[in-house]
């Protein structure tokens, strides 16, 4: 399947299919040099898939640390210096092969190298179906996640579904959080549909039918980011579950999607408090338990520490913490939330696990 962005200009294709990786070769000839920045774990399993591409004299492979460990100033400088040592021109391509962190990191390299070179995303995880589309790239700071970055569109997104076959279950769980988030944004019917399809751990682990939901997720994100590329309005909705989730992820060092799922439950609690919504918190907690999400760490949440991370969230303004909240399905808002409400919601979340 081929999707296409519909911006007024500078559009790019998104290939979502088995065997999509073959499309890379059609781009290589266009560039003076190409650098494949590949996640160390992906390289272990799939190095042979890039043998043909690496046979080109102008194509280089750079193995980078897996996951968030790569999104540091140190790794950024080391990688940039290596690429610059090849006397690159602006007609250079950075090709990101890996999960969301790899795409974030490689995209920031592409955005800043010579003030911008070509960038191709080759996502290899379910999680990256979200991050590879929309043009957000960046690295982390000691103050929080993704605080240093840019909006930078790729030249193409090449999503070969073959990569998903070797994902460990932890990564399936992490990626599913973003797929589920897109369903929540699409409303009650879409949420019920995905919950009925992926109703337990066994079905989720099989990935049966995941292709369809990944494609739906990409289409959902495309509709939003094309309407609001620079996150001035509706694009903020894509941060559902992320205000609290990022804080939990950064402090407790758990996978991104696991933390986002905790953040989704948390925002339901906040919405119930602020709007007298009637979200069934037990339903969502039980659903996550059925899927196999490890939630024991919720009892160890320390609000004061997490709140300091929430204060650094990119959605905030001078008035304080802003959260994306589902008031009712189909009625999503970006709302300022006071510290006391946030604290009470954290305390209430913990009561479900005592």
From Swiss-Prot:
Keywords: Amino-acid biosynthesis, Aromatic amino acid biosynthesis, Cobalt, Cytoplasm, Lyase, Metal-binding, NAD, Nucleotide-binding, Zinc. Its EC number is 4.2.3.4. Pfam families: DHQ_synthase, DHQS_C. Zn(2+) binds at residues 178, 242, 256. Its cofactor is Co(2+); Zn(2+); NAD(+). It catalyses: 7-phospho-2-dehydro-3-deoxy-D-arabino-heptonate = 3-dehydroquinate + phosphate. GO terms for molecular function: 3-dehydroquinate synthase activity; metal ion binding; nucleotide binding. Binds 1 divalent metal cation per subunit. Can use either Co(2+) or Zn(2+). The keyword Metal-binding applies. Pathway: Metabolic intermediate biosynthesis; chorismate biosynthesis; chorismate from D-erythrose 4-phosphate and phosphoenolpyruvate: step 2/7. InterPro entries: Dehydroquinate_synthase (IPR050071), DHQ_synth_AroB (IPR016037), DHQ_synth_fam (IPR030963), DHQS/DOIS_N (IPR030960), DHQS_C (IPR056179). NAD(+) binds at residues 100-104, 124-125, 136, 145, 163-166. One of its GO terms (cellular component) is cytoplasm. It is found in: Cytoplasm. GO terms for biological process: amino acid biosynthetic process; aromatic amino acid family biosynthetic process; chorismate biosynthetic process. It is an enzyme of class 4 (lyase). Catalyzes the conversion of 3-deoxy-D-arabino-heptulosonate 7-phosphate (DAHP) to dehydroquinate (DHQ). Belongs to the sugar phosphate cyclases superfamily. Dehydroquinate synthase family. This is 3-dehydroquinate synthase.
